[in-house]
Amino acid sequence: MAITQFRLFKVCTCLATVFSFLKRLICRSGRGRKLSGDQITLPTTVDYSSVPKQTDVEEWTSWDEDAPTSVKIEGGNGNVATQQNSLEQLEPDYFKDMTPTIRKTQKIVIKKREPLNFGVPDGSTGFSSRLAATQDMPFIHQSSELGDLDTWQENSNAWEEEEDAAWQAEEVLRQQKIADREKRAAEQQRKKMEKEAQRLMKKEQNKIGVKLS
């Protein structure tokens, strides 16, 4: 029984392979026929009537034929020059403010004073000296506030008096600072003694209260 079933299975498999092979051949032949029937034949002739006509192409040498060959300026060369000058004058000068102004510096020349030669009684001329007297006029400055320079007397003790006044002011300030410091210390000591007295009074009151109880 098992042998017959095995033989039937082999026969069925062989038939299935044969049918599948035939089916593939049929499919391939159908595809080839469809491709051969779908071929499109292109026309070999070209219709030039559908092509748009091109415009006439001009040569590049004929472009400037219509251009003017000469330009005539009315009024002559003189009028053109005057017009150009007037236009240049109307244009504002933007760099006018930026031009530097050059000023010459004033030179002060000091001339050397020539030495004066005073005659000696015997007729010979003497030599100049820095201690020799000159003929310059004396300069006297008069002021309404300070008075005449001749009447002003120099006080040599002015600097010493100012130093003494400054030292006295510093001494007064130092003494005042010491007094303020001592006053603050005395105030702190008084407050401390008052606090101590209050603390002792509280202790005494507590002791009296304990004794009465």
Curated annotation (Swiss-Prot):
Residues 179-213 are annotated as: Disordered. This is Receptor-binding cancer antigen expressed on SiSo cells. May participate in suppression of cell proliferation and induces apoptotic cell death through activation of interleukin-1-beta converting enzyme (ICE)-like proteases. Its main location: Golgi. The coiled coil domain is necessary for the homodimerization. It comes from the Eukaryota. Homodimer. It comes from Mus musculus (Mouse). InterPro entries: Cancer-assoc_antigen_RCAS1. Widely expressed. Expressed in heart, brain, spleen, liver, kidney and testis. Induction: By 17-beta-estradiol (E2).
